[in-house]
Amino acid sequence: MAKQIQAIRGMNDILPTQSPLWQKVEAVLRSSVAAYGYSEIRTPIVENTDLFKRSIGEVTDIVEKEMYTFEDRNGDSLTLRPEGTASTVRAGNEHGLLYNQEQRLWYMGPMFRHERPQKGRYRQFHQFGVEIYGIGSADIDAEVLMLSARLWEKLGITEHVTLELNTLGDPAERAAYREALIAFLEQHKDKLDEDSQRRMYSNPLRVLDSKDPQVQSILADAPALMDYLGEESSQHFAQLRELLDAVGIQYRVNSRLVRGLDYYNRTVFEWVTNSLGSQGTVLAGGRYDGLVAQLGGKETPAVGFAMGLERIVLLLETLALTQDIPAEVDVYVAAMGDNCLVEAIKVAQELRSALPTLRVMSHCGGGNLKKQMKRADKSGAQVALLIGEEELAEGVVTVKYLRNDNEQQRVARNALSAFLAELTK
């Protein structure tokens, strides 16, 4: 027997038993962004490597350690996209979507990072994100947070997630704070872990995000970014909090919250949960007003967020919130005897035409009634429609209930569509 080929480590199949939950999550995401008037954008999985070096930052973990990068036959350096924002900006610049325009966009698709696979963190993962361009005021920051809060409400996990909020100020304010933070860290250099020492000069704000307990203890006395904010940044953050208070979205200001990507400024946020262990962040984002110009466009304010679908699915499973996932099939059509096969197929086709949302599965492959009923039960259908010689002669179909103890009944074929529409509504 030939050796089986396995999936690449950290790149997982989504099996038929799992896909209904994924479809439910995706449907919630699509309906939510539609309710806010956002438009979908789809970008290639592969981009020029320079796109991510220029946007994410060359000294970030993603660019230094995690990207899937290769040379094609022309000698060009290409990368499987590790996140969606940079591709969205590239597409907006390339196609003239962002110049003097407001755009509210969303995307969904696979991303790739060469990380150590663990629960909730994979090398191929599916990301959903929204990106808004051309609006620099705090009200649009509030809108993306209201949209994210609506997602949790529709998924039934509002009580299990918490919003953490911070501001990074504008580039000048952040530069001044950066110098103060470096000066502080230099005083404690010998006590910093290896990662923090490496980041101290290249990306000191990332030290604030260290998980090392000793580093966190040192940071308790570090200068606060809030003390370096100018009036405009302070007002922006104050207005955002006022708007969130007005609509009842609770949050916690976390002055240590920074994002792992270099392009963020002012508002940054994360939705976190205590239900997934170390992988507690379920959605993250913020404002990135300089990225469009950094990638060759005009100065354009921008804000957005991204979330990993694997982590949302895992959270729903962990919280046992998967019971209401419907079966893939509503009705199973079975023929009792070879002479009835043609009519059974015709009944199934008639139902699909009359009731486009009804999910109808026809039995194929022959077999006795017991075998067909076993498959019908396994399909998850509510009812089986049985068509035999007697049913054909009388112009009826026998309806057998599979999920309750109701007695089977006969329904006239010309009334079957109306009967099933009422039964499955």
Curated annotation (Swiss-Prot):
Sorted UniProt keywords: Aminoacyl-tRNA synthetase, ATP-binding, Cytoplasm, Ligase, Nucleotide-binding, Protein biosynthesis
Primary localization class, coarse: cytoplasm
Superkingdom, taxonomy of origin: Bacteria
EC category name: ligase
Signal peptide: none
Annotated transmembrane regions: none
Keyword S-adenosyl-L-methionine: no
Cellular compartment(s): Cytoplasm
InterPro entries membership: aa-tRNA-synth_II (IPR006195), aa-tRNA-synth_II/BPL/LPL (IPR045864), Anticodon-bd (IPR004154), Anticodon-bd_dom_sf (IPR036621), His-tRNA-ligase (IPR015807), HisRS-like_core (IPR041715), HisRS/HisZ (IPR004516), HisRS_anticodon (IPR033656)
GO cellular component, one term: cytoplasm
Pfam families reported for this sequence: HGTP_anticodon, tRNA-synt_His
UniProt similarity note: Belongs to the class-II aminoacyl-tRNA synthetase family.
Protein name in UniProt: Histidine--tRNA ligase
Organism: Shewanella oneidensis (strain ATCC 700550 / JCM 31522 / CIP 106686 / LMG 19005 / NCIMB 14063 / MR-1)
